[in-house]
């Protein structure tokens, strides 16, 4: 798939704030703070500043909607697991995400995991929660450029002590080199055509 047009539409907290079009597919991106959600969105759309990136974890505090090719939405969800945020704010982010995931919108959730880290309890809870809600989801391992092939193989072995998956069922992505970009876009196109 070629992304020719990508526009920020709006930020939302409550369901009443979501875009009104229910017929458009939504690809939502969720993961720990600083896992690279905004960088991945910028990589997929080939727009360096579409989704705001920051070295400071916890910058994405709202649900951000981007309309792609006037056909579907990319949705940037708030990150979870950032310790330096007040408990009340964490609770609010959690409720914002819960409302979105529980909404009856046509969506697929991409769960982003940093390949350098074994999945946290929060990552596992997110995956279990998606399964409990019978949500369609895929895992994307980010920051693959930070490890050599040998280190990556070792790390995947460690990750599999906490998470069961086949390498063919997940995506591997680098925002630095755009490795994995085409595979993710092709998968999204398949979902749109089904």
UniProtKB/Swiss-Prot annotation:
GO terms for molecular function: GTP binding; metal ion binding. It comes from the Bacteria. The keyword Oxidoreductase does not apply. HAMAP family: GTPase_EngB. Gene3D superfamilies: P-loop containing nucleotide triphosphate hydrolases. InterPro entries: G_ENGB_dom, GTP-bd, GTP-bd_ribosome_bio_YsxC, P-loop_NTPase. This is Probable GTP-binding protein EngB. The gene is engB. Residues 23-194 form the EngB-type G domain.
């Amino acid at each position: 798939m070629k992304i020719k047009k990508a526009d920020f539409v709006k930020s939302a907290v409550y369901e009443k704030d979501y875009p009104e079009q229910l017929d458009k597919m939504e690809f939502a991106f969720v993961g720990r703070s600083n896992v690279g959600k905004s960088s991945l969105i910028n990589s997929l759309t080939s727009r360096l500043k579409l989704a705001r990136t920051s070295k400071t974890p916890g910058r994405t505090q709202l649900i951000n909607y981007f309309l792609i090719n006037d056909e579907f939405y990319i949705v940037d969800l708030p990150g979870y697991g950032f310790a330096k945020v007040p408990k009340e704010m964490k609770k609010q982010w959690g409720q914002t995400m819960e409302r979105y995931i529980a909404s009856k919108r046509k969506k697929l959730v991409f769960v982003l995991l940093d390949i350098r880290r074994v999945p946290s309890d929060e990552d596992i809870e997110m995956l279990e929660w998606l399964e409990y809600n019978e949500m369609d989801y895929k895992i994307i391992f980010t920051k693959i450029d930070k490890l050599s092939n040998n280190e990556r193989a070792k790390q995947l072995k460690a990750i599999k002590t906490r998470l069961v998956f086949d390498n063919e069922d997940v995506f591997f992505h680098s925002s630095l080199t755009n490795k994995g970009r085409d595979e993710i876009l092709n998968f999204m196109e398949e979902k749109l055509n089904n």
